[in-house]
Amino acid sequence: MRSRIALLLCALLSLTACASTESTESAQKTPKEDVVINIVGDVHGESAIRREAISSLRLYFEDGDLNIFNLETAITDEVKKEEKEYNFKADSQFLQTLKSVGFNVATIANNHSYDFGEQGFLDTLQNLDKAGISYVGGGVNSDIAYQGQVYSVKGLKIGVLGVAKVNGGPLSIAGKDKAGTTNGYDAATTERAITALRKVSDIVILLPHWGEEGSFCPRDWEISSAKKWQSLGADIIVGSHTHTLQEVQLKENKLIAYSMGNFIFYSSQLENRTTGILKIRISPNKRISYELQPFVIDNLTKVPVISEVASSYTCENQAKTTVR
């Protein structure tokens, strides 16, 4: 009798061990950690910026799987400028500084990446590659510019696409055999790109360069564009260009931040120095949550520091909070 009981106990223990092993293997296959994505606004490397101060930002990006920024400049030694009011460029070492902080994804879908023509733009692509910073919103031709990037992070596929509604003009737009950015005014191509990215991604992030400079409120056509893009599969939309922080909304697991304003950029006005880091968390079951960590750009270093000012800047209360 005792031997039978012993055999039964061994069998039960064996089954328990097997079940435990299967459970462990199953848990390993299922992602348990949230994906963390930090997104900021405009970054350029003009001489007024104290680069040594940028290192202080590192701790705010340590948790990020993807740390995304709008590279509002060409990275080039090219001297031939496009004819426009402002032309921005920086050296390749600036990218190394950004990389050391944790930035690993740049959108180049804007009106300054082509400031030094096609050669300056191509230099920018090469320098980003050398720095180990991925990019979206542009490429050596239109196929690459519109295909976006898909990042495999903690068991989820995160698709990212940059869309230049405000761009550097007709010459800056990518073509079949020409380098350049996407063109947000080409609705059909943009919508096809979103649809294609949706098919290969668990989460789609869209980064439009749009909006009216200096405004705290999105315009009607930006709101309607966002709704259309969401209907095509965009889960997260984070804009830039206005040089101001605009409102953030999360409804029915769709997140939109109309503009993240400036980040590493110079301006004397408080409303243009008010900024933040949009810290997005995506759960294993694809639930989206966010926190806006408020900063203000220091007037001396042109690099942001923690501040509660940003939390009060919304479309609804801009009249009473704007400092002029």
Show which residues each predicted segment covers.
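Sec-dependent signal peptide recognition
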Residues: 2-8
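Residue-level signal for mature regions of secreted extracellular proteins and peptides
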Residues: 11-12
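C-terminal motif of bacterial Sec signal peptides marking the signal peptidase cleavage site
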Residues: 16-17
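Acidic, metal/ion-coordinating pockets
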Residues: 20-324
